[in-house]
Amino acid sequence: MAKAVRCYCIYGLGGRWWSAGMEDVLAVNLRKIKGVICPPTFQYGHWQIIVEAIKNSPNDIHVVAAHSLGAVRATQITDYVKVDLLVLYDLAGGAPSKLGKNTGKCIDIYDTIPDLVPEWRVQAVKGHEKKIERWYSQHGHTGQDDSVPLMRRVEAEVMKLAA
């Protein structure tokens, strides 16, 4: 039997107000992929619920996609459990955890309009640097999660896991 792909999306600091695309663009399309389970998008402060959900399904494939401060919290999830694919939409609002053995692949979608805090780009512990793939966009911080072209790229990565 094929493993389920469990996708967890997380809003940024402004919740749905600033990150509606995490639900309205990304999550709704991930739910259309056969074999993907994607619950409603989480508030950034609820990241520990995702940790517990992953602990309760250790044999499944896990994807966490998050925007802004939610992306910071997404990196913290990997401090506790394994995440096969971590997608960070313009991480901001705090210093992320360094990625290591609990991270399969990380896509860091970095928006350059404007480049608010470049030192907050996600990093990996020594020996895990190649797990981070950097994508660049120019949608603005609050527009990145609404981008259909970016969503299609993320969707393609999830489809590989669901195949």
For the regions a protein language model found, what residue spans apply to each?
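C-terminal catalytic-base region of ester-bond hydrolases, centering on the histidine
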Residues: 13, 98-163
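Short, structured coil segments at secondary-structure junctions
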Residues: 26, 81-82, 102
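Conserved hydrolase catalytic core segment
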Residues: 76-84
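Gly/Ala-rich beta-loop-alpha elbow adjacent to hydrolase catalytic centers
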Residues: 65-70, 74
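Active-site catalytic motif of lipid deacylating hydrolases and related acyltransferases
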Residues: 2-60
